Amino acid sequence: AAATEALDDAPRLSAVYQALLNEDLGADGQPDNSIFLSAGDAIIPGLFFNASETINGERGIADILIQNELGIQAIALGNHEFDLGTEFLAGLIAGNDAGFAGANFPYLSANLDFSTDTNLASLVVPDHQSPQANSIAATTVITVNGEKVGMVGATTPTVDVISSPGDITISPLPFDGAPTSEQLDTLAAV
């Protein structure tokens, strides 16, 4: 969502999602079970990201507003969410006193421990709950047409090398891009 093409892409993505919501693949008159998720990197510094400051008073707000408007139900924390540090990310998730409500969805990551990061620790909510706005969790449970679906987020273990995750504890570590079978097992167990 960081490039200027995001303004063109958001309506197209929304149209595709709305078409999928209107599908009746079972031909039973019931809407199909659709969940709208993002794999992360929904906030990427760039021209569009920076232009948000002129319009919304702070960089990145437009990215969150687009995700909210699209109806995203959960986003995995990608490495780019941390590019400007955890204090900046916390402000985008939680909102601000100037009227920006923040993210209408949770950010997910099961392999990051936020308890040691003063900026994000207060946004962490219990796992296995319905999606909560302005929050971070390892998991969430989304109910669609009475059916509960569990979501688990994971963030690249190299985030500390390629971004700025602050005081977050990352699992598995050390992780050099050539994981051992033990490291892969640790990540899979998350």
Task: Label every PLM stretch briefly.
Residues 1-190:
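Acidic, metal/ion-coordinating pockets
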